[in-house]
């Protein structure tokens, strides 16, 4: 059965998300995926360079020392930290932790996640630099 009624379609501009700060920040947070793709491609390129020997690896290291690549990697680091911060702030909302009949606030969970991140980072750096 078909109808001749034309449904109302609310007009929506392509810049609807720019009107509220919440949506602007949401788009920024979702945009952190783009630098992550860059870093993933860079890692794969590095793995292939490592596979093809010392000369290829030295070429990759030279590529990493390019100022443009350093800036892109710093942008990627900032995007990853922003994404991590927002993810850690979301985690307490998803977990309902009760201690002594009281719901735990978000601060200990967020701080705990940052501590775990710092410890894992230090361990990885230690293994990479001194092992």
UniProtKB/Swiss-Prot annotation:
Part of an enzyme complex containing four subunits: a flavoprotein (FrdA), an iron-sulfur protein (FrdB), and two hydrophobic anchor proteins (FrdC and FrdD). Gene3D superfamilies: Fumarate reductase/succinate dehydrogenase, transmembrane subunit. It is found in: Cell inner membrane. It comes from the Bacteria. This is Fumarate reductase subunit C. The chain crosses the membrane at residues 30-50, 57-77, 109-129. It is a multi-pass membrane protein. Two distinct, membrane-bound, FAD-containing enzymes are responsible for the catalysis of fumarate and succinate interconversion; fumarate reductase is used in anaerobic growth, and succinate dehydrogenase is used in aerobic growth. Anchors the catalytic components of the fumarate reductase complex to the cell inner membrane, binds quinones. GO terms for cellular component: fumarate reductase complex; plasma membrane. One of its GO terms (molecular function) is succinate dehydrogenase activity. Belongs to the FrdC family. Keywords: Cell inner membrane, Cell membrane, Membrane, Transmembrane, Transmembrane helix. Disulfide bonds: none annotated. CDD domains: QFR_TypeD_subunitC (cd00546). Its main location: membrane.
């Amino acid at each position: 059965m078909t109808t001749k009624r034309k449904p109302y379609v609310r007009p929506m501009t392509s810049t609807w998300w720019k009107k509220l700060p919440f949506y602007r920040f949401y788009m920024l947070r979702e945009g952190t995926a783009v630098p992550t793709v860059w870093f993933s491609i860079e890692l794969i390129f590095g793995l292939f360079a490592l596979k093809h020997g010392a000369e290829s690896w030295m070429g990759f290291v030279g590529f990493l020392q390019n100022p443009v690549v350093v800036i892109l990697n710093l942008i990627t680091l900032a995007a990853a930290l922003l994404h991590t911060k927002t993810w850690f702030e979301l985690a307490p909302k998803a977990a309902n932790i009760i201690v002594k009949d009281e719901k735990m606030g978000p601060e200990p969970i967020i701080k705990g996640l940052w501590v775990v991140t710092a410890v894992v980072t230090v361990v990885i750096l230690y293994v990479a630099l001194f092992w």
